[in-house]
């Protein structure tokens, strides 16, 4: 219901990771990475499926050994979401997972080896139509760049990225995306800004090693939010020392906050004060858990009193404004009903689910009408 944010996205080339389009105006893809041992096939498959359920577009899997590469083959056969193989140090592992149907190869230029080894990986990727992510990281810059700059700087990350972009260009390979990650927000943001001016390849965003669930989410929201608000970024990962499922949730929350891409419910809730007429915090927490399965984009405002409640409800798909014993329910800005404050959670859950079903049906009909023309 709110006005769409006027963000003009940076123009970039289109590549595909499996069936997921990246760049050239495609929806910004949200991805995560497994933290199981890849050789534990069952645990890794279960985690990937959990990530799929919360909306992951792409999942990255670390493949540190040949044994992990063999496990990757079995994992790939059991999941639907596109998989990126994360390769460090041994280029031969990249060649092996390419045989097993990997959807994208992530290589780190600082440790994958010499130009000949990179050429072998690129030739294999070209033959099998596999895109590559050049993953530059402030913590693993090439030794000569560490010596040249003394410490990670935006210029150092840019030079590392461009060195390998130029190498891929010389090999006539353009199916790649690039990241220049750092754990420092300002270093990462400025590095991406510089890179965005130099190339038109898709950019994968991330604040690497951001921290735990709370601090990492804050760092990522600031860093990725700055870049996304400037139109920079085609895919992202929120790196958290937490359950990877939380990375997907935070990633979508960032996109929802900027009104770039919505999945599920955007809850608008007051921090509460003595004026609240019902338990706002308990209601929001309960509904967030109960309604995780809803993927329909909706704005739901839950405000405990009449100070700001009616105003928020006017621009929400559904809105509740606290009142004495009963609270006003608004739908699409129009007051419809009153809900008993003592049964708020169950009543509101039912109304939200009904509204989601109605919106889904309306979209289905719209799609059918468009396809019929």
Curated annotation (Swiss-Prot):
InterPro entries in UniProt: Dihydropteroate_synth-like_sf, IspG_bac, IspG_bac-typ, NO2/SO3_Rdtase_4Fe4S_sf
Keywords: 4Fe-4S, Iron, Iron-sulfur, Isoprene biosynthesis, Metal-binding, Oxidoreductase
Residues that, per the record, bind [4Fe-4S] cluster: 270, 273, 305, 312
EC number: 1.17.7.3
SUPFAM superfamilies in the cross-refs: Dihydropteroate synthetase-like, Nitrite and sulphite reductase 4Fe-4S domain-like
GO biological process, one term: terpenoid biosynthetic process
Family that this chain belongs to: Belongs to the IspG family.
Name of the protein: 4-hydroxy-3-methylbut-2-en-1-yl diphosphate synthase (flavodoxin)
Organism: Klebsiella pneumoniae subsp. pneumoniae (strain ATCC 700721 / MGH 78578)
